[in-house]
Each structure stands twice: as structure tokens, then as C-alpha cells.
Regions:
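C-terminal transmembrane-bundle signature of multipass membrane proteins
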Residues: 160-230
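Hydrophobic alpha-helical transmembrane segments and adjacent interfacial helices
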Residues: 25-41, 85-104, 164-178
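Membrane-water interface of transmembrane alpha-helices
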Residues: 59-69, 116-138, 204-215
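N-terminal topogenic module of multi-pass integral membrane proteins
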Residues: 1-70
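Loop-to-transmembrane boundary segments
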Residues: 10-23, 144-167
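Membrane-proximal helix-loop-helix units in multi-pass membrane proteins
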Residues: 88-156
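Cytoplasmic-side transmembrane-helix entry/capping segments in multi-pass membrane proteins
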Residues: 75-86
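Alpha-helical transmembrane segments
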Residues: 44-57, 102-121, 190-198
Length: 230
């Protein structure tokens, strides 16, 4: 009777390992593109482009942090291929975005496209939240997934739309008044707003993880006990 239970635990661990490995690899690739393109603007003559490098770093930190949080709260057997395909698509978006450091017009256009890719990822992941709610009957799991579901909806209905609109507004502003933003260098205010928004979001993710930490441990223990009883 214990063999199937042991197999489920082993498969859960295997899927978690795959997820963490994929996250590390694709964000490592994104970091390579960021550093490779950052070296072309890191001079005093291009100091106005430095915030774009910081914004890129914040994007990587946010994606990695959210991915790890997602893995620790939701990932179990079976492996979710579409979810991982979304991750790869997001990494491609990051790589393309980082090639446009030093080009504010293209940066904000691609930032808008990137937000449009990440936005439906949160909607898709609601399926995984519902799946975990069904196979996790404990009290800790119920509280954990109530918080996770609330966070998913907050991202779908508020945080991602706000980020999308911020980037879209910045892109349209540059297209409407290129001399004001590009020639006169006022694009630094737009990238400054993006950096602040990304920094605030990263702080939110870190604090949210702190709230979930004890519930993640308790839920994993409940999963283990459920597996042992089967």
C-alpha cells in the first residue's frame, strides 16, 4: 500500500526539481542578455540609460522570486507543460527587451508586450490553485490557497493591468512627443516611474512570501501525512 504513496512523493519532488531548474536556467539566460547589453551604456556619457539596467535587474528578480514562490506553493505531480511554456515565452520576452537598453521608444513598447505575456500567465495558474485546493484538504492548505488565490486575482485584476497601462502610457507618450522625451532626455522620468513600480512590486512579493512561509511548511507536512495514510 505504501508503494504508490512513495511514488507520488518522489514524482512531486522530481517535478519541483524540474521547475526550479527551468526557472534558474531561463533567468540565467535573461541575465546574460541584460549584462551583455548593459556594458554598452555604462559610461558617464550615457548615465540617462543606467535606470534601464536597474529596471531589467528588477524584472529578473521579480520573475525569479515569483517562480520560486509558485513552485513552493503549487507544484506537484503531474508536470504542467503549458505553464512551463509560458515561462519560456516570458524569458524570450525578457531577452528581447534587454536588447533595447538605450532605446527608450523600443524599451517601453517591448515592456508593454512583456506585461501582456505575463498577465495571462496569472490567469492560467488559477487552474493550478484550484487543483491544489482539491487535493489538499488540511486546514493549513485551505488558508494557504485562500491567500494564493487572492494574490492571483490581485495580479489579474489590478497589479498586471496597472503595469501594462504604465508601460503603454510611456510608450504612447514617447511616440506622441519624441522631441520632448528623447531629444530633451525627459524619458528618464518614465523609466524612473517604471523602476519605482517594479521595486514596490518586488517588495510586495518578498513580504507576501514571508506571510506564506509558515503555511507552506504546514501544508507540505499535511501532504506528507496524507501520502503516508494512503
Amino acid at each position: 500500500m505504501k508503494a504508490p504513496s512513495a511514488s507520488r512523493s518522489e514524482l512531486d519532488a522530481l517535478v519541483v526539481g524540474i521547475e526550479l531548474t527551468l526557472t534558474s536556467i531561463i533567468q540565467g539566460v535573461a541575465l546574460y542578455f541584460l549584462t551583455d547589453n548593459a556594458r554598452t551604456v555604462l559610461s558617464l556619457r550615457q548615465i540617462g540609460n543606467w535606470p534601464y539596467v536597474l529596471a531589467g535587474l528588477l524584472i529578473i528578480l521579480i520573475f525569479w522570486s515569483r517562480s520560486v514562490l509558485h513552485t513552493l506553493t503549487l507544484i506537484r505531480w503531474p508536470l504542467e507543460f503549458p505553464h512551463n511554456f509560458f515561462y519560456i515565452g516570458c524569458a524570450l520576452g525578457e531577452a528581447l527587451l534587454f536588447t533595447r537598453i538605450g532605446s527608450p521608444r523600443a524599451w517601453f513598447a517591448l515592456s508593454t508586450a512583456y506585461a501582456a505575456i505575463v498577465w495571462p500567465l496569472f490567469a492560467y495558474d488559477l487552474r493550478m490553485v484550484r487543483a491544489r485546493e482539491k487535493d489538499s484538504a488540511g486546514d493549513a492548505a485551505s488558508r494557504l490557497y485562500a491567500l494564493v488565490a487572492h494574490d492571483q486575482w490581485a495580479n489579474i485584476g489590478l497589479l498586471m493591468p496597472a503595469l501594462f497601462l504604465l508601460n503603454l502610457t510611456s510608450a504612447l507618450s514617447i511616440y506622441a512627443r519624441p522631441h520632448f522625451f528623447l531629444v530633451e532626455g525627459r524619458h528618464v522620468f518614465l523609466i524612473g516611474a517604471q523602476v519605482v513600480a517594479l521595486a514596490v512590486y518586488l517588495v510586495y512579493v518578498i513580504r507576501f512570501f514571508g506571510r506564506l512561509t509558515p503555511l507552506i511548511l504546514a501544508t507540505r507536512q499535511e501532504w506528507h501525512m496524507e501520502t503516508e495514510r494512503r
